């Protein structure tokens, strides 16, 4: 099915919800990782529609650990979207972590701020991977929740805060200027115009450190901009 054996292995790991059986991702070169990702996304596109894009490694610390000075990008497909308030099983993921993000809805009339929760996942054992590994491994995607678009001009909002709770207990809180999220669209300037879609959802990077996802009722409260929730079951 795939030209590259790594693509076949990652596809199988995703389908079977397991870690890869190959050597560490350090053996992957960037050009090969990009080619693997192209193969995998082409296969996903045959069964699920493109709905948006994600930006990964948006903070300086993660970029430094990956040896890069810019985020990586990855397409989001419809099978990765879950509805606000839905239940989701841990059996769907290998090593999931939760992130709360400023999402964007980019359309012909402008840009809307959108609350976003991303469940990141990794098919390399112990999350030990390099930048090429992250790119090849579906951009570390697990699932996404996007809320309703926030009314008003994003330029008029100076800060968005989020508090993440599990079963009513605060796990983390964070904040960011949405102007920084909008500015990151420059890394998607080609992608947002090449596929003919009139609207895209964009996950722009986490406001918090990734939290290991356990069973329970999770809420990401973005204050006046609304909240997102999900029930995680075993």
How would you name each of these model-derived features?
Residues 2-193, 214-215, 219, 225-234:
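Catalytic-core "active-site belt" of small-molecule-metabolizing enzymes
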Residues 196-211:
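Conserved metal-binding segment of the jelly-roll/cupin
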């Amino acid at each position: 099915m795939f030209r590259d054996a790594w693509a076949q292995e990652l596809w199988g790991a995703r389908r079977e919800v397991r870690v890869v059986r190959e050597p560490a991702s350090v053996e992957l070169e960037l050009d090969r990782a990009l080619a693997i990702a192209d193969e995998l996304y082409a296969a996903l596109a045959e069964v699920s529609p493109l709905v948006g894009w994600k930006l990964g490694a948006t903070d300086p610390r993660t970029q430094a650990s990956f040896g890069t000075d810019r985020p990586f990008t990855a397409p989001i497909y419809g099978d990765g979207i879950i509805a606000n308030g839905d239940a989701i099983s841990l059996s769907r993921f290998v090593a999931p972590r939760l992130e709360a993000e400023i999402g964007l809805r980019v359309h012909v009339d402008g840009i809307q701020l959108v609350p976003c929760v991303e469940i990141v996942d990794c098919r390399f054992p112990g999350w030990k991977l390099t930048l090429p590994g992250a790119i090849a491994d579906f951009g570390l995607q697990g699932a996404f929740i996007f809320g309703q678009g926030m009314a008003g001009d994003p330029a008029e909002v100076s800060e968005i805060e989020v508090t993440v709770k599990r079963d009513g207990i605060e796990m983390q809180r964070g904040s960011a200027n949405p102007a920084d999220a909008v500015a990151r669209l420059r890394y998607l300037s080609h992608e947002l115009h090449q596929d003919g879609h009139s609207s895209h959802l964009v996950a722009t990077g986490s406001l918090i450190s990734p939290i290991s996802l356990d069973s329970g009722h999770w809420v990401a409260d973005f204050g006046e901009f609304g909240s997102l929730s999900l029930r995680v079951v075993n």
